[in-house]
Amino acid sequence: MNLVKEILDIAKQAPSGGNLQPWHIHAISGKKLQKIVSDIEYKIAEMPMGEKTEYDVYPPNLWDPYRSRRFKCGEDLYKSINIPREDKGARLNQLAKNLRFFGAPVGLFVYIDRKMGPPQWSDVGMFLQTVMLIAREKGLHSCAQEAWAMWHSTVNKHLVVDNKFMLFCGMGIGYADENHPINSWRTEREAVSYTHLTLPTSDLV
């Protein structure tokens, strides 16, 4: 846990408009983490899609090209671990692994004040990426997980969080099984042509 504290201490230098630093982090491990995981495992059979998020993870009626990218991402992920589209049970089991932090020994729960707006959500995103990059530099792996937002009520009760804060996501930190097929799978990305460059060539060197 000391290494995680060190990572968070460096990551706090992430860009933040007006230096608001709007991220609020709960880092847990051991019995406290297991209690949350066990509680959700007990409930998930009755509520496979959780308690509903307090924000839209994706915009309603997602449109192309974003809809197609999301669909392909999901299909390719399940294909990498040989779970066919029609095997709903296996897909739900894979989703449930999110709620065990994929076996990671440390879990972060990331909150933001409900009054904050899009610029502050952007700050939180930059903070999270900074955490992930520093973790890698320190030899650790991480996984940011918005799936935890589906269980905000349960998590809040365990952590005794003031209602003025909203659970944005979780993040598992640990050591990845680099031999597992899912950890060698990569999402496809658009070519750099998505960037509209208007600078003279001489300014790019």
Question: What function would you assign to each model-found segment?
Answer:
Residues 97-106:
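A structural motif
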Residues 27, 107-109, 170-172:
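Conserved hydrophobic/aromatic beta-strand scaffold that supports enzyme active sites
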Residues 1-98:
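N-terminal amphipathic, basic helical "cap/leader" segment at the start of enzyme domains
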Residues 6-12, 106-158:
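Small-aliphatic-rich amphipathic alpha-helix that forms the alpha element of a beta-alpha
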Residues 31-34, 114-115, 177:
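Short, charged/polar surface micro-motifs in flexible loops or helix N-caps
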Residues 161-182:
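A glycine-rich helix N-cap at a beta->alpha junction
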Residues 195-201:
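Conserved small/polar residues in nucleotide/adenosyl-binding loops
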